[in-house]
Regions:
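A beta-strand/beta-hairpin structural motif
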Residues: 92-96, 144-146
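HotDog/MaoC-like acyl-thioester-processing domains
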Residues: 1-31, 103-108, 112-160
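Short structured motifs
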Residues: 94-100, 114-115
Length: 160
């Protein structure tokens, strides 16, 4: 838990615009402590409705998209990874999330992330990062995300 607190302190200072980052695959792009940057986008009920349809979610709780589904916010963790590191075939392994509040139609969604681990396991290259999703600067979701960014099979073909 201490690592999350440290990572979030770093994230508060991030303010990096992903569009200015070179999309790269070198190891330095995934080094522990690397800030993946901050993305900002408006959240609208229309986007929420599209997500609910794609996810086949029909709970009235989300008010036809006016309240953001947690899956929509979690997907931003994938996007921030893809926006920073060139990805070929990759695998979303696991996410551990905490919900802190709601994101509503018309609010600005902001996603921040920082690398906490970059390891090789069973031949797979795995990156772990802490992330936050904010709704108009209020914490809505935080979590940790694990992804195999280079599967063993891809590495074996590349090195053959």
């Amino acid at each position: 838990m201490a690592a999350w607190s440290l990572a979030f302190a770093i994230l508060e200072l991030a303010g990096v615009d992903l569009r200015r980052l070179a999309v790269a695959a070198p190891a330095e792009a995934r080094a522990v402590g690397t800030v993946f940057g901050t993305t900002r986008e408006p959240y609208t009920a229309e986007l929420g409705r599209k997500h609910l349809i794609n996810a086949r979610e029909d709970l009235a709780l989300f008010d036809d998209g006016a309240i953001c589904n947690p899956g929509y916010m979690l997907r931003r963790a994938n996007y921030i990874l893809a926006g920073h590191v060139r990805l070929g075939p990759w695998i979303h392994v696991e996410s551990e999330i905490r919900l802190h509040g709601l994101l509503h139609d018309g609010e600005t969604l902001e996603t921040r992330a920082v690398v906490t681990e970059n390891v090789e396991k069973n031949g797979h290259l795995i990156v772990t990062f802490d992330f936050q999703v904010l709704a108009d600067e209020r914490l809505a979701m935080s979590g940790q995300h694990w992804a195999i960014y280079e599967p063993r099979q891809v590495r074996e073909k590349t090195n053959a």
